[in-house]
Amino acid sequence: MPLDRAKVDNSMLIQGWIEDCVVDFKRLYPNLPEKVIRQTLADVAASHGHDVRAVICNDYDDDLMLYCTLLSVYDWIQKKKPILGGNGTFFRDQDKASSPIANVILGRIAARKAFQKERDTWDQDSYEYAYFDMMQKEAKIKINSIYGSFGTTSFQLYNYYTAAATTGTAQSLISATAISFEAFLSDNAKFKSIDEFVTFFRNITNRDTYTFSYLEFPVIKDRQKVFDRYWNHFFTEDLKTDTAYEIMHKLIWSCSEEELTRLWYKNNLYTFMSTPTMMRLLRGVFAKTESFRNPNAVPDNIQAEMDLIWAYTNDFVFYNHAYTERINRLVHDRRKSVIVIDTDSNMINIEPWVDFLKDNVWTQSGSTMDDDNLTYASVNCIAFLVTHMVRSLLAKYCKDCNVLDRMASRINMKNEFYYAKMLLANVKKRYAALTKLQEGKEIKVGSKKELDVKGYDFRKAGVNEEISAKLFDILLTCIMRPDEVSVSRILSKLDFIEKDIIQSLKQGKRTYLLRMNCKVAAAYSKPESMGAYLAPLLWNAVYPENEIMVPDKLDVVILRGVKEPEILALKDKYPDEVERIEKYIFHGPLGERFRNKGLVYLALPNTGDDIPEMWWEFIDINKTVARNLGTFEPVMAALNIPMITSGKEYKYFGNILDI
């Protein structure tokens, strides 16, 4: 249903849209009177606009339901300025309401920072460092548990919307930083419609204010050059319609020299850094400094130059406006700079930047730094810039969401790690990274923090500690540290581990047994199908004098489905054990299951004793090998080395590459 004229005239959203469009249409149709443009836009809004019905719910106020329209909600937001959550939840700001639980969170945040500060005064391999690192992690867990509790129905302050708002805001923030990094570092925020270009154009030529004169840099006068750059910036070729061509052409041909220059350098980092002014500043930084390890503690003798580099970059390169479809872009679009996204972090590829400085600055600056320090200085130059960039970005995000200035500074991202190499996987939150710097401090070779592993199976709970340590060593020494990866060396070490597992199992050693978190029957919906339940059940039936108490984490022997006749064959040698197996296992409450499937899992008590000799011949060696080495499969898959299946249970790594 068309909008009535009064609603068009009184809607803050529509009137704001008209004001924006007037600016654009005056460029597209310079001879058309502004009054006619405004009238036409108002007519379009009235004939094509729809005021969608909306509902505002407050479940802190007896589930109050307010039925309204989307335009009225927008006007209310503009007038009342509530804090906007990531999922459309509105909050009163701290000047209008107080929250005791918020003070608890702020207290925990302050405590965590204090622990981190104290931690960093100690050597990274010391007991004190580990203690304060553990304490700051505990504080973080407490903070996150408070957030999560709001989504738990049993919590006194449970709210249907609050937990989702926290998650939605975090997702919105991380996607906002990701697309901004893509745009800033690699000009990779493509236009998905001509409307996006028009908004981009309007922000640069009409909305933004600038500190420096465009005349300080090479002036761009070639309109075709600017047009070609942005015409090739559409996400897909089918967006390059005749209408889009006409609009872009008219807008760019309406530009002054200053507007062309500012359009050319926006999100065009390397072109801008190649200008004489920026080259002089960058070479000056490298000529004057002897070491630049921490972007948050710039050496005094280059502070002025670094501040000026950022000021120029902020003025000419950084586009500090929201991009549309941020979350969708994050999930679906091909990225160039943001190579890994974790819950609250973006990991960015800065190799192009380091290569750029290596080719244009290192030698030309006359720097006396060695290659390592030149690399660190290059890394921290861009870290300094992106730290300032993301600070400005998040400040504007908070302002747009009506967060009070004094609270906005709490939403921030910091540069924490410099990873020299990363091994990625085709699964989210799974990577291995060789750490060189943490907050400016060099991570020594052999330090516990040298290799950061997240999400890979061989580091997860339940994996044998011996296997985990050996596979970790292969990853570190054969893949992450070397400049070139030797596949033959990796396979040789894996083969050695496999032979060691086989030899160990044949001798009844528990060294390479799987580790399971065994629980009572009530913890499982179908306990009879869970190896973690059946394993201690078998042990307790056979060895009641050394009973296992659950819940507990236990070493578990994988058996090859031992059937009743095989057990009966041992009656002469192990009469008591066989009798108990017959009575309590094969003919006990779960007898039918054991008679059909056989004995597959046997738990061992945490005494350190070896596997009882009675079971040695029944150990499923192939399955145990595959289950242990299989935890390394995602690492090898990242190197395009697949596991080869041989038989039902046995897998091994071959020397065949997936290409």
Question: What residue ranges belong to the model's regions?
Answer:
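Conserved acidic
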Residues: M1-I659
